[in-house]
Swiss-Prot record:
MF terms (GO), sorted A to Z: N-acetylglucosaminylinositol deacetylase activity; zinc ion binding
Higher taxonomy: Bacteria, Bacillati, Actinomycetota, Actinomycetes, Mycobacteriales
Protein's recorded name: 1D-myo-inositol 2-acetamido-2-deoxy-alpha-D-glucopyranoside deacetylase
Keyword hit for Ribonucleoprotein: no
Cofactor: Zn(2+)
Length: 317
């Protein structure tokens, strides 16, 4: 296939469910529009808190079988995000499922020998670069440098992807394919105005017993001017909610309110748009590449128009 036959997008996240929470609507829209959509997940999410009482024995401090269960949940979620025309979202695991383990939320270094944040960074970055060369994506999407609400695996995954994009473009490591330069790199995020508006709208509704409205600062929203790309997912919000429900050990979905909650029971809105931050990519000489990792406190140039699609400017109809 010619590299320009159809658009390809690779989403890279730390745990199962990150993809749906942060960009599920965009993944569904891209798949429906005919793009080849792939997901690279770095861990099985073994340290997640199980909210379903009948499944709590799967937890890490009990039977420690949650990772395998979440593989099936993720497969179901991706099926629900896939196109009605039968397009599938391809699943990849960083060096194979279970190679690295969820590091958990607790502060301090996870002492598990396979903890994601304790792994060999070079080995992990090369594994991610191998997937990039296999998929040959025009667009890569991952966590922001602060990891959203600060999860250490999210922060680590951001660093990993930045390095992997550079490795994939270099004239090295021919054992895992020809070099590939990613055209656009995005971080996930949400603008402050849209986030607070969504919470205000949800707050006008009757919140189910046992839940509370999420606090506005939990998502660590971005200043509006930092957001470069706003994708309309109105037609795909139902698919996103269905995919969220597939992650049943981690998420409770309230379809009638277009909202969900994690183990904290904080009801969180699912807006009809998803936001991203475009990261400048500059590749110089083969042996002297440079990726400009945008300062999270900076903002796009004043003359940069806000995008409405991840494929903007790439020449795809």
């Amino acid at each position: 296939m010619n590299d320009n036959d159809s658009p390809r997008a690779l989403f890279v996240f730390a745990h199962p469910d990150d993809e749906t929470i942060l960009s599920g609507g965009t993944m569904a829209r891209l798949a429906a529009e005919g793009a080849h959509v792939s997901l690279l997940t770095c861990t099985l999410g073994e340290e997640g808190e199980v909210i379903a009482p009948e499944l709590r024995e799967l937890a890490a401090d009990r039977a420690d079988q949650l990772g395998g269960w979440r593989i099936a949940e993720l497969r179901s979620a991706l099926d629900r995000l896939g196109s009605p025309r039968g397009a599938r979202i391809s699943q990849h695991w960083l060096a194979g499922p279970g190679r690295w383990r969820d590091s958990g939320m607790a502060a301090g270094r996870n002492t598990h020998p396979r903890a994601f944040i304790g792994g060999d960074f070079g080995e992990q970055a090369r594994a991610a670069a191998k997937t990039i060369r296999e998929v040959r994506p025009h667009v890569v999407v991952t966590h922001d440098p602060e990891g959203g609400y600060g999860h250490r695996d999210h922060i680590y995954a951001n660093r990993l992807v930045v390095e992997a994009v550079k490795i994939a473009a270099a004239e090295t490591h021919s054992e895992f394919g020809a070099p590939w330069q990613v055209k656009k790199l995005y971080w996930t995020g949400i603008g402050e105005s849209a986030w607070r508006r969504a919470i205000k709208e949800l707050g006008r509704r009757a919140i189910p017993d046992g839940f509370e409205l999420v606090h506005a600062d939990v998502a660590k929203p971005r200043r509006d001017e930092e957001i470069t790309t706003v994708v309309d997912i109105g037609d795909y919000r139902a698919a996103k909610l269905a995919a969220l429900a597939a992650h049943a050990t981690q998420i409770t979905v309230c379809h009638e309110l277009a909202a969900f909650a994690l183990s904290n029971k904080a009801l969180t809105p699912v807006p009809a748009e998803e936001h991203f931050l475009l990261v400048p990519l500059r590749f110089g000489a083969v042996d002297n590449q440079d990726l400009d990792n945008r300062n999270p406190n900076s903002q796009p140039p004043a003359d940069q128009a806000r995008e409405d699609h991840l494929l903007t400017g790439l020449g795809f109809a």
